[in-house]
Amino acid sequence: MSYDLLIRGCRIIDGESAPAYRADVGIQDGIISAIGPLPDAEAERVLDCPELILSPGFIDIHTHTDFTILINPRAESKIRQGVTTEVIGNCGSSAAPLCGEKLVRVREQNKDLVIDWKTLGEYCERVNIQGTAVNLIPLTGHGNIRSSVMGYDPRPPGREEMNRMLELLRQSLEEGSRGISTGLVYPPGVFSGSDELVELLSEVSRFGGIYSTHMRNESDRVEEAVEEAINLAEKAGVSLQISHLKAQGRRNWHRIESCFRKIEAARSRGMDIHCDRYPYIASATDLDILLPSWTWEGGSEEELRRLSEPTIRKRIRDEITKDDWESVIISRVATEKNRKLEGRNLKDIAADRRLEPVDCLFDILMEEELEVEALFFGMSRDNLERILKKPYCMIASDASAQADYGLLSRGKPHPRTFGTFPRVLGKLVRRGVLPLEAAVYKMTGMPAEKLGLKDRGVIREGAAADLVIFNQAKVK
């Protein structure tokens, strides 16, 4: 038999939690055609891999590559980690649908791109015309739907608005979306209530999709947030994915045990519920996450106006209780004049400016017109390992595809951008936190099952040949 590619003598981890075994693999037309001893096989290309491991390509179930893939379709920060499939559209924000205020805001935030689509179908056509190094599985951002219909108003939708939101969601699901995501700490998701969300989730359930949620709280009220996520999904009868499970802040580390109990109780009732996590103890998001949610009402222009008014600044200052400003590190700014702030913490920046850290926060947000990203330390390493060990936890980067050159090399991104999967396979597996087969399953077969992918995430005859070869002793 002749193949396009023959991989000889590799140690196979099949993505289904089975023990590793040694075999040859023959690949033809992008499909795994044969697995086993193939001593007489020929191929256009032969790889002899007796010291290496062959696994399914990794499925990154929580990413933000929606727009960066159009800047650089090579997705190098993902491909170099072994990622072959990404789930985009997380945390309530996706590339589509884009209407009304959402379209205006996305164009403002992505000046390096021509945003010439409005629907998911049009976005997918744009990506396919350009090409992409990774498979992309889209979710529909609840924030897109809500802001497309009713902007950033802090109120429940009226019946006509709700119907329009359902129409936009239904169209996206018909055009290939695998479900919906929420970002309930971000505008406009923070303004949404349970009735609105259950109605949308019920529509997703009818399509057999999933609900991925950046919960309403990940610190002082994380237990309530887990309960809310479970209740919403249970009422709607939809599969639940809790994004980047954590208990942020030392005073909340003990709360993770209660979160586990709630998740496991729901699973024991038959709920399809999982979570994901990156292998680091710092998170990353927009700097204005530190502001009270009412400052976001009405959109970015209103937020900047509030920051410019002394009396409102005082009110905001009085509501911010943060004191560990050294744990907040600026990772990316928009202007050249503040580039020197990247990689530095707010406490030190404030000292240089002879300001209180909270006033320094306000000034930086205004100088950058809110376009500031930051890293936030405050998670427990012990909790991290306990989360990753859970049989319902997958590995995810929570990062967009980046590069070390060009437009995507700006700033000092979270190391998860380039290091999530190697860190698990190298550091955590070698330390015995996870067995190798279990770690690979969390990156391959488990997310494939969650997403209903039949031909990805596994090594079996007839499956797509999205594969990764790595040296377990050296991966880092």
Question: Predicted regions span which residues?
Answer:
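Acidic, glycine-enriched loop/beta-strand segments at the rims
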Residues: I12-D24, V372-G378, N383-L384, G432-V440, ...
